Amino acid sequence: MKAYKLILMFFALMLVNVVSAQKNTNGNVVAKSRDISDNLDLQAVASIFGDSKDLEDFEKKLNDPSMQISNLDLNQDGYVDYLRVLEVAEGDARVIVIQAVLGQDQFQDVATIELERQRATASSSSPNVNIQIVGNPYIYGPNYIYEPYYYRTPVFFDFFWMPTYRPYY
């Protein structure tokens, strides 16, 4: 009888461990204060995005300590988080995702840059590119959107829609 109870307790304990291991471990980093958005100014991000020659150059500029663009420390380890840049392409739309690297295989989306090419019309000979920089609502609050205006279309925007272009990872 004692052996039966021990075996039953063992299986009950194993069941509890399996159930707790199945819980979703994905989570979002939530801003502790409203000032966290000051640590990465999306207008400054838009400025260096327009000045960059490609996405690799953009990522380097985001993380360059001499440029002082980012001061994010989302994992609160006392160091500025590295920002990586990813690209997702579909048709005439491109989404550039800026993610903070929090740890090994742990990333938090900070902002996205959404580009959409409008086809050339009779009134304009070249296609127009609409750009929106959208801050993560957990960090910047809801509806934090910046639409930059560039006097001259940045050179590398044309590369996004070339037949030989490969997305940046």
Regions found by a protein language model. Give the residues of each.
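Low-complexity segments
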Residues: Q99-Y169
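Glycine-rich, compositionally biased intrinsically disordered regions
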Residues: N63-N71, V85-E87
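Extracytoplasmic/secreted cell-surface and envelope-processing proteins
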Residues: D92-V95, G141
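Short N-terminal segments immediately surrounding and downstream of signal-peptide cleavage
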Residues: K23-A44
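Acidic, glycine-anchored loop motifs typical of Ca2+
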Residues: S70-Y82
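Bacterial Sec-dependent N-terminal signal peptides
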Residues: M1-T25
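Post-signal peptide N-terminal segment of secreted/secretory-pathway proteins
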Residues: Y82-R84, R94, Q99
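Start-of-domain marker
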Residues: D38-N63
